């Protein structure tokens, strides 16, 4: 057909020769005829002498050929891959020796989801150029923000040295606020692909994820991505990997996930490097729940990693944590779409539906087993403790039940979030939620709105402080001499507190050398203490700082990116509690305290925060019949004050002359009336004012 096209268009012998070579090459590599026609016709239609178009066409042809070769997953001398039905039959009989469980870990925006797309295309799990990029990023918030916030799983098949292998792939988030997703995913893995951007090199979350993998003693496959970009520097990045992690540069794979270059070598290296799972198929069934989500028709769906034995449909399973028994209604494997299978065996990952209607019954990290069988807990995953807390209230109290249901379903899908009941005289009944960071909080609330139609009011984030009590009565009430508090309204009186402690984090910052001075100034401004500073190479520095958590949860990351022109990266981990000097900042309106507006701040920041709050309240509180004095106080000391003038009624407007004593009498009566009003009147603060002050 191609020769027919060439004769029809009467083009030069050179083009016909190129087409013939292309056809021969494609047929040798089993590329489908549609690809042959696409490449050849574009070449035949090229105008003679158009060198620019010719260069583009050659590059495009190479790209299409590489990606098509990856998609077909066929090399010379191998047979065609089996159909989907054949693969699912193979799934049931796949020996443990030919199973590999691995995750892709990297810093944010290093190309994890794009590489996952190429791997899915290469193994035939999805169609090439299916019209959707980042297939595993299926949440609306992920597509809007361009980041991965939820780890996703896909089971793929790949032929290696004549044998078919089952690879369970997990694409993980790269932002530090979603490190719980990475930790949860690694509980079901035996190895990781450590992906590094060949342009930006090793960044903060790369370091954190690498150490997390090594703590679990997982095999590491180092891969450099984006080698097709003009300013990529793979040699220097390989040296950085050697300096920081001791990785041999010769072991680092170089790929372009965008073009598909070198992607097949990644799968080959995974099969050769990552060990098969250490499981037992001849023992009693035991599995770890490492993810779950809610389906309105099937209830809670649980993603399980089978540690021992085998699970079949219609068997009865029991939760080790709740002791409740369920019947398995369906078993599926994610490819990444759900594909029903009759059973799952040790070493495999499966999705089970067991009519679990209460979202609280599904616990990530729980162990499940067959009914009336005694097994030990898996114990390989523990949720991280939240660092940032915020109040969540319904905009309308009539929607309290609906918001509660939405939060329960979201927490099922995000086990890092903690929920406690809270109330506020200004905002009504609500909850106090714990998150791993500010972005985690923003994404959670955005998902509440998009996926459940909720309209929550989110208060300003805070952290948990630890107090050592000196009051015997309070110690007896608490049952111990310490008290953890994240709500400033519950802050005890200073005379009842012996010591204050605030949470710290160990932050890792990687920045270009020209911005080191600005970064140090920012850290000092946020009360940071430098722990170490290492030159990665001639252009970048890795610094470690101990910082108060309260100083970084709001705008630290934004400030860091701004002063470094976007080149610095930052990640952090919990560093315990440290003694500090904290005070409770109270807001008074005409001498009366307003508990809903109080805050806990460090003594060095108290004056600045006080000034900001009184200025904001002056703008938000409307004028009233009496003058309003807004004061920010620590104890009895006033740190800042603003005044809202009262409405003025011109009581002398009706006078048109006469004795001046009449005018003075009216003004005196007005002054006495205002004085009396100040003594007995309550300041009316609109509900919207509280919302605007309290919300982030």
UniProtKB/Swiss-Prot annotation:
Q: Where is the signal peptide?
A: none
Query: What range does the transit peptide cover?
Result: 1-76
- Domain tr-type G: residue ranges: 97-278
Q: Which CDD domains match?
A: EF4_II, EF4_III, LepA, lepA_C
**Keyword terms:** GTP-binding, Hydrolase, Membrane, Mitochondrion, Mitochondrion inner membrane, Nucleotide-binding, Protein biosynthesis, Transit peptide
**Biological function:** Promotes mitochondrial protein synthesis. May act as a fidelity factor of the translation reaction, by catalyzing a one-codon backward translocation of tRNAs on improperly translocated ribosomes. Binds to mitochondrial ribosomes in a GTP-dependent manner.
Instruction: Identify the PANTHER family for this entry.
Output: TRANSLATION FACTOR GUF1, MITOCHONDRIAL, TRANSLATION FACTOR GUF1-RELATED
What is the designated name of this protein? Translation factor waclaw, mitochondrial
**Which residues hold GTP?**
106-113, 171-175, 225-228
Q: Which family does it belong to?
A: Belongs to the TRAFAC class translation factor GTPase superfamily. Classic translation factor GTPase family. LepA subfamily.
**Which terms in the GO cellular component ontology are assigned?**
mitochondrial inner membrane; mitochondrial matrix; mitochondrion
E.C. no: 3.6.5.-
The biological process GO terms on file are:
positive regulation of translation; translation
Q: Could you tell me the gene encoding this protein? A: waw
The entry's localization annotation reads: Mitochondrion inner membrane
What are the GO MF terms of this UniProt record? GTP binding; GTPase activity; mitochondrial ribosome binding
| Reactions catalysed according to its record | GTP + H2O = GDP + phosphate + H(+)
Question: Gene3D superfamilies attached here?
Answer: 3.30.70.240, Elongation factor 4, C-terminal domain, Elongation Factor G (Translational Gtpase), domain 3, P-loop containing nucleotide triphosphate hydrolases, Translation factors
Q: Organism's domain of life?
A: Eukaryota
